[in-house]
């Protein structure tokens, strides 16, 4: 009888946790413990059970909703496009990150998928101009530190740019810059559509010891007016696939010492 009552209380509590996630993008263990008057161990067990049931995704110190959408920079209104490819790219890219790294993280939906995995590492600091990414880390990743670059807000796009952003980038240094091109054009390099974003991306690469470009196959020979980097300016490129071997061919044509590594996710 006591076991049945305990189970009923647990079911009610877990239903209430799911209601919390309906109103917020994330929930923390400490918040659950305080709200329901249970221990942290019990709160974690509730989240683990809900995760095993496929109702939420566990993070370090809490959980996030599988259904509630975050507001993402509208420079790329494709949060629900090529999701599997972006997640595969992120999973491969996380292998380039070591415990204790400082990362410069670009704006974009693939960058957000990458950031979602940072709780797999310890002692990470993220430097970014993307407000959505900073919000996500603040709400869902208590173990990850975040530094916001200053600047002017590009309205409707949720990222910062301009002279203050550029000045801030001259004052920081990262182990890895994680870049998300708007497009890759074989004869040009990595591009974006907004000139001030191009200069920000260029400065991010310059401020890091190494850099990686994350892009799904749709970006190959796509459209982009402003180049922010040549192929050889990055150290690694991570893709879900390389259409017509366009990127591999461009790499083969580069000088040996300057060739970036190409990683095909899942290959």
Predicted ranges, named:
Residues 2-104, 115-123, 138-143:
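HTH-adjacent hinge/linker in prokaryotic transcriptional regulators
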Residues 109-112:
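Gly/Ser/Thr-rich loops at beta-strand to alpha-helix junctions
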